[in-house]
Amino acid sequence: MLGVRVLAVTIPTLYLWLTVNTSWCALLFLALLILTGAMTPTEVWAGSMGHFAVITMIVFSILNYALKETGVIDRAAAWFISRRIAKGRPLVFLGLFFLSNLIIGMFVDNLSLAIIYVGLAIALADKIGVKRGDPFYACLFIGILWCNVIISIASPIAHAPVLILIGMIETQLGITISYAKWLCVGVPFAAVMFLAMMAAVTVWRPNAKAFLDFDTASLKPEPLSRKGKITAGIFLLTVLAILLPEVGKVVFPGHFAFWSQIGVVVPAILAVCALCLITVDGKPVLDFRAACSTLPLPAILFAGVVCVMSTPFSAESTGISSWLSGLLQPIFQGLSPFGTLALLAIAALVMTNFLSNVVTMVLFFNIGLALLSGSNLHLGAFAAVIGVAASMASLTPSACAPAPLIFGPGHVTVRGVLKANLVFLVLSLAACLVVVYPLASAVFG
């Protein structure tokens, strides 16, 4: 009966997430979960709002605000696309535009970056002389969306889907994945997907005649302000403080053991405090009150709730995992474990282009655990594949959070970018199975 009660509150919650919103509905789920008796109130609060993903999102959102307000992101993007090598070479220009998005996006919130890049693309299109309806114009904007879905799962820094997935893997599988380990998988995946993007553009071959007379040197960025330089410097030190201990503890375990144990949030908190303490012209570099007012509270609440959602599903006391396994085994009978993984990845890829990415990820994560728990597959690597497949959402206006920024104003149409989009999605599925799974199996241990 305990499992029935959990399903009785989970299924309606999933429906509300898909049809209403993921904010107050997420809070409602916490209350209902306690009422089922599957978890105590203390366990629910600790596993949701007390989860490391919540504080991580809060702190990195504040850092992201500082980077945006001081112009660091804008100038980094402008530096890439103003290179001389791009003059008269439309494919090179598009490659630099996409590459700048991917590299910057590995360290900042992808939705905020999408907003910045949409504004940048509008300005670029005006200078180049292309308008809505032109293939080159559409290519700029669909590329922003492609980059966005890639970085949302390739890097754990300031990206909620990765933090949620890492949390579920640790809670349900007992596998601890550091930022450095995830990046060992995410960076090669992003590199392969950059090539996939360029392949999709090459197949598309958008008319770039208007670009040939455009002088990319006109985009040369202005120097950073003093606030911008301080923010950029402190952020780079923060990234080094997060990544170096994971590398250093292998070579010098005695020196880096402590720093690798404190986690990723402490350096970020120290960075926020430093930006609040350092003043320029009598004012702090970071306006903490203003930064807090921009926190994406609904997304933070949702992340915390999703982190605790898988716990009752895998608990022996509820029996849900065993029930799901018995229910689905006949459907997958005859398939090898890797065949099952591939089929689940395909299903997740299709579903995520119409429904919520995180809901898709959570759903197929739990289905996969029920089906593959007794197999010889690396379950941590399976989770990574599902996470990546559930993030490749670029086909429809409802595919992901930034999609309305691209489709809504008419920058692109579903039909206009369909061919290139399908090439991108097929290649992303191949990357999941050929790149992500073997790398994650080797790196996650």
Predicted segments — roles?
Residues M1-L7, G50-I62, L111-A114, A190-A191, ...:
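Structural signature of hydrophobic alpha-helical transmembrane segments
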Residues M1-T56, K181-G326, V423-L429, L433-G445:
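Hydrophobic transmembrane alpha-helices of multi-pass small-molecule transporters
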